């Protein structure tokens, strides 16, 4: 059986969850349509998602059509959940991008399409809600061409009046874009030679799967218009990006979820091989796990299975698998499936409204951070405050609501702050010798540090010979330094520097790698005290798309948010502004843009790097480490 995995993406309220229900219903997977309003849909099944009318976590369901099984990934549709979007995109064979016929291309539509293009996902545009009053499809087509891509193929003719009718084009009017994009076909067409339908279809298929051509279909998910045709398109146009024939097992964990009974589930996309119940499987070329229970989605329901084939999405109950873990042969994982998660740029202090719920809060955060790599937390060693790092305002609102709904814990939030970095100010060296108090470890370590230009990152090298200090000791020093770099003099991550391991001494047989691992961060702290450090704050590069009439307002507001606009373009009655802005200002600038453009602006951002800050340094308390904190304190007293 052919197995394909598709994503359904859209801006808020475009109807993606309703479309998922219609696909399930028309294919026979379910016998009754669920309702978004009543909260009976197969996806968006948490109270929070139903209340907000948005998808927050990736939902998975499926249907079967003839000899094809289709797994549907109902992805989030908000800026703060793009990490969840990217994780779900990584397992897709294709995507359906919904566009409301009434609303046209919205800001979130553009952001999602940008993600699809970046990931190289073949995409179909589905214009939904064509049965609403006042629809002008020609305006929607123009909107798509100007804001998404001009390389579209209108696959259907839509008659709205007097009776709605959607029919597939069969003549040459749909092929203009296909012909124009191929020099050989264009030359043949211009010379008057006939073009065979087969060669046009082949060219369309090639460009569709290369993400350089996007077919457009129409319908109404709510009133079951165009859904049967869309099912045919899905099962015929998309194909699975899996290894055919016998091969080694390869699968990737793309989602971790906890059930109401606190069972930990790992969602895995299989790219090759067969996974059997009771198999012992190697994970990320390290440890092995045993498959004791295995589930998959069958016609909208989770069912136990005893084997799963390449292309399938399976769910394992497992305590050890992590997000992005690879089962089996890592070399067989498709290259485009590897993606870096963005770094959280903000942090906030939280506390339970009821002090007696502190342990419940910590347990809940442990589960939430396990399933969301963009949420991290630690407990301050001095104040015992709980500090979260996160991406955006809505993400924090959702976490607060999730804690209340699922874990029955209410929290109070302080003002968020940006996450800084540190860089050494000058070159410095420091050595701690073995058997010289207060050093309690059987190790000597000498380090040097020197600042590097912005954008260089942290570089490490060892000038100590492996012939003298073997690899296990050298690795321990490097691990200790990486740990020490997590907290500089002001408590922030140390970067933009070169650290050199210059001197090492051990006593055989009493010295162990642990001695070097624990001493290294203490030496690093002392050498940083000699060098001094400066704070760096994160800067984002941005690209703003806004209606042309808002150009002057966007320019005038830029200095207020410390934004520097470096390039301006005018295109299709739209202004495109490029520049950079401190991360601490982006939330307000984006909110302001959305407000004064009435939601018609788009602001895409990426981390550009770090700039030196001015003013008083912002300090962050150190995280505790019971094994070395006492020694740190003793060295700090004598230095």
From Swiss-Prot:
Residue positions binding GTP: 10-17, 74-78, 128-131
Keywords from the named record: Antibiotic resistance, GTP-binding, Nucleotide-binding, Protein biosynthesis
Gene Ontology terms for molecular function: GTP binding; GTPase activity
Keyword Hydrolase: no
Record SMART domains: EFG_IV
GO terms of biological process kind: response to antibiotic; ribosome disassembly; translation
Domain tr-type G positions: 1-242
Signal peptide: none
Role noted for this protein: Abolishes the inhibitory effect of tetracyclin on protein synthesis by a non-covalent modification of the ribosomes.
Protein family membership: Belongs to the TRAFAC class translation factor GTPase superfamily. Classic translation factor GTPase family. TetM/TetO subfamily.
Protein name per UniProt: Tetracycline resistance protein TetM
């Amino acid at each position: 059986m052919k197995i394909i995995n598709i994503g359904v993406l859209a801006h808020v309220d475009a109807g993606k969850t309703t479309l998922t229900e219609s696909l399930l219903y028309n294919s026979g997977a379910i016998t009754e349509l669920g309702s978004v309003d009543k909260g009976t849909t197969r996806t968006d099944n948490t109270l929070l998602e139903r209340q907000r009318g948005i998808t927050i976590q990736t939902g998975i369901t499926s249907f079967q059509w003839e000899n094809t099984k289709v797994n549907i990934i109902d992805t989030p549709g908000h800026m703060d959940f793009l990490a969840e979007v990217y994780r779900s995109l990584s397992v897709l064979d294709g995507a359906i991008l919904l566009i409301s016929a009434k609303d046209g291309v919205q800001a979130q539509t553009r952001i999602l399409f940008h993600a699809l293009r970046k990931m190289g996902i073949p995409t179909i545009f589905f214009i939904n809600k064509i049965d609403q009053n006042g629809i002008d499809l020609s305006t929607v087509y123009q909107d798509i061409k100007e804001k998404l891509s001009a390389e579209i193929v209108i696959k259907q003719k839509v008659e709205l009046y007097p009776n709605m009718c959607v029919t597939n084009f069969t003549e040459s009017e749909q092929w203009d874009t296909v012909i124009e994009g191929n020099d050989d076909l264009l030359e043949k067409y211009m010379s008057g030679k006939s073009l065979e339908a087969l060669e046009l279809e082949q060219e369309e298929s090639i460009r569709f799967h290369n993400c350089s051509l996007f077919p457009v279909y129409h319908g109404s998910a709510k009133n079951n218009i165009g859904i049967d045709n869309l099912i045919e398109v899905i099962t015929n146009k998309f194909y699975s990006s899996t290894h055919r024939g016998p091969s080694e097992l390869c699968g990737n964990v793309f989602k971790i979820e906890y059930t109401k009974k606190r069972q930990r589930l790992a969602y895995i996309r299989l790219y090759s091989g067969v996974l059997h119940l009771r198999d012992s499987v190697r994970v990320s070329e390290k440890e092995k796990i045993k498959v004791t229970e295995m589930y998959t989605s069958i016609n909208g329901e989770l069912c136990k299975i005893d084997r799963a084939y390449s292309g399938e999405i399976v769910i394992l109950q497992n305590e050890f698998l992590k997000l992005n873990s690879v089962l089996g042969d890592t070399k067989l994982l498709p290259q485009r499936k590897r993606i870096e998660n963005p770094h959280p740029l903000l942090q906030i202090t939280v506390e339970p409204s009821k002090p007696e719920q502190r342990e419940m809060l910590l347990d809940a955060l442990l589960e939430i951070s396990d399933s969301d790599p963009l949420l991290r937390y630690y407990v301050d060693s001095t104040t015992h405050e709980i500090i979260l790092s996160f991406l955006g305002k809505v993400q924090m609102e959702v976490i607060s609501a999730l804690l209340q709904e699922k874990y029955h814990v209410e929290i109070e939030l302080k003002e968020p702050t940006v996450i800084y970095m540190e860089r050494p100010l000058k070159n410095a060296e420091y050595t701690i010798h073995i058997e010289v108090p207060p050093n309690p470890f059987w190790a000597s370590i000498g380090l040097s540090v020197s600042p590097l230009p912005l954008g260089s990152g942290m570089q490490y090298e060892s000038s100590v010979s492996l012939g003298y200090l073997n690899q296990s000791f050298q690795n321990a020093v490097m691990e200790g330094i990486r740990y020490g770099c997590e907290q500089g003099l002001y408590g922030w991550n140390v970067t933009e520097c070169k650290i050199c391991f210059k001197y090492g001494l051990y006593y055989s047989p009493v010295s162990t790698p642990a001695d070097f691992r624990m001493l290294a961060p203490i030496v690093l702290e002392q050498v940083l005290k000699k060098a001094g450090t400066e704070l760096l704050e994160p800067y984002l590069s941005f690209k703003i798309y806004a209606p042309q009439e808002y150009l002057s307002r966007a320019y005038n507001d830029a200095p207020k948010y410390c934004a520097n606009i470096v390039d301006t373009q005018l295109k299709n009655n739209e202004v495109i502004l490029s520049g950079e802005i401190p991360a601490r200002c982006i939330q307000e600038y984006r909110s302001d843009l959305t407000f004064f453009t009435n939601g018609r602006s788009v602001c895409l951002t990426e981390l550009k790097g770090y700039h030196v800050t001015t003013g008083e340094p912002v300090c962050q308390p150190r995280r505790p480490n019971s094994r070395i904190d006492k020694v740190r304190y003793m060295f700090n007293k004598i230095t």
